[in-house]
Amino acid sequence: MKYYAAGQTSVDKTTFADGQVNGPYLGGTGIYGYGGIRVWTEDVSPVLNVASDFYDFYGTWIDENRVDRTHLNLAYDKTFFVDMVYQENGYYESIYTIQEKIDNAFLYGYTNCRLEQIARIAGPQAALYLYYEPINTVFWEKFREIRDASGLKVMWEPGFSVCDSGFREIFLKIMETFRPDMSTLNWFEASAMFGTKDEEELIRIIESFQVPFFFFRCGKRGAYALAGGKRFFVPSIDVEGYETVDPTGCGNASSAGAMYGWLETGNPVMAAVMGNISGGFNVGQFGIIPRFDEKMRQTAFAKASQVYSRLLAENPSWEKELEPFLRK
């Protein structure tokens, strides 16, 4: 399987609830997603529309990590700068003036992955992590035609600057129209969109989408793997040497890592374990993971095996619940 990650690039600054300010540093949804997969395999490429100053920021990182440039498309002038402000509960939002929001909304369109870019990488042995807003139903109708004709596997992470119930109708329409192979939301997004803080109710709503694999992220607590009418909660995973520094991008990295785990194993628990391990690497510094190597990959696979064995020992009923997935 060949893997791809599509989203945005940005230079980020974070302000935490205690007033600590860090940055600027390299970020972006597409790059974080790429990192979540690259932890596990070198067979992954970013699919990005980039700015003319992109290599001024990312050039050294790309060279040192031998990142495939084939699908980097020059599309606009200046890389986005994003200012994220976190609350104590982990919720964050980007802070802009009204004029900045208007300007960014116009320019942001240049960063989104295009249908022709997707068509170029689509195939039965290809998988795409895509960060894209729940907007533009025509895009999703055309995308489904490409996906169905090619056999491309898709993990859709809906993109939100601020999520609220106003997105519910179009989100549900896209879910019905496109029917992604895999998808993900975090707790804040799901709660805001569906108007409830009841986790059981949120899970029932998500299960009604009938997505084959859904990665429901619950922040520092961990994530649910929802598949085949079953649900498995996998706590967040600490990776030795990557103590918690900054959660920015962990949703992107973990969702993309979970996609890799699901497609490689067909096991929802292992997929969530691998996703959470990708997040565990991502949280260990400000910005994107600086360096990928064989030692990291060996550490990741060893950690996955260790955590998976422990989870099955702690949850003896899971072995039987997982049988339908492991027989495929």
Each model region followed by its residue ranges:
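Alpha-helix C-terminal capping segments
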Residues: 35-43, 261-264
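Conserved N-terminal subdomain of the carbohydrate kinase-like
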Residues: 3, 11-24, 41-129, 151, ...
